[in-house]
Amino acid sequence: MTKRLSTVQAVRLCLFLALSIPLFSSNGTGTETAGTGKTQQSFPVETLRIVVAGDLLLDRGVRQRIGQVGIDGLFSPSVDTLFLSSDYVIANLECPVTAIRERVYKRFIFRGEPEWLPALYRHGITHLNLANNHSIDQGRNGLLDTQEQIRKAGMVPLGASRNMEEAARPVLISARPRPVWVVTSLRLPLENFPYLPQKPSVSQESADSLVMRVARLRRADRHCVILVLLHWGWEHHLRALPGQRE
C-alpha cells in the first residue's frame, strides 16, 4: 500500500480498493451433491475487477506538478498496470473540472482544467464520483459543467445532477453477467452552500434513505452487487468514528 500511494505522487489517490467480484452466468448445468442425492445448479464463474480509489485532487500542489511533468506524469507504471488491468476504476474527483469560475464563499476552493480529463480516461479511470464537499466549489453551474466535461472525456459522472433526486439515483455500472450498482452520498455538511433539492447538487442522502434505497435494489434483484460509496469521516483520522461504525 505504501508503494502505491507514493507512486501517485501529488494526485492524492488516497486508497486503492481492488474488488474481484465473482459473477455467475445464467447458463447452468445440473450436478449431484455428494451424499445427498440432490441436484444443484452450477454456474460458470466470471470475475469483474473494480478498483475504488480515494480523493483525486487536480489543484494546489497537483496543479504545479502538472505544470512541471504534464498530467500523464502523475501516473506511474504500477498505477497504470493496476488501473488498465481492471474492468472499472472509480475515483473521487475532489474538485470541479470546469472553465466556469463562480467561486463559493468557503475556506478551501479548488478547480481543475477540463483539458486534463482525457488523460484520466487514458490511464484507466472510468467513473468519477462527485458526491463530495468540493464538487460545488465553482457553484451549481460549475458542477453541471463538470459533469458534461467528464462525459466528453469518455467517463461517467456519479453522485451529482440537476436535482437531489437525480443525484442520489443508483448507477448501474455493469449489467452482465450480474448487475453491479453504485450508490453514492456526501455525509458531511456543505460550507455556505444552501440545501436546495430542486437545484443542481451532489447526492446528500440521509443514512435512513440510503438504507431504504439499498433495500429496494436488493428486493428487485437479490443477486445484484451494490457498492455504497460515502464521503464522510474526520479528515486526517485513520479510524472510523462511532457514527460511522453504527
Short names for language-model regions:
Residues T2-C14:
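Bacterial N-terminal signal peptides that target proteins for export
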Residues R12-P22:
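Bacterial N-terminal signal peptides
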Residues S26-E246:
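Acidic, metal/ion-coordinating pockets
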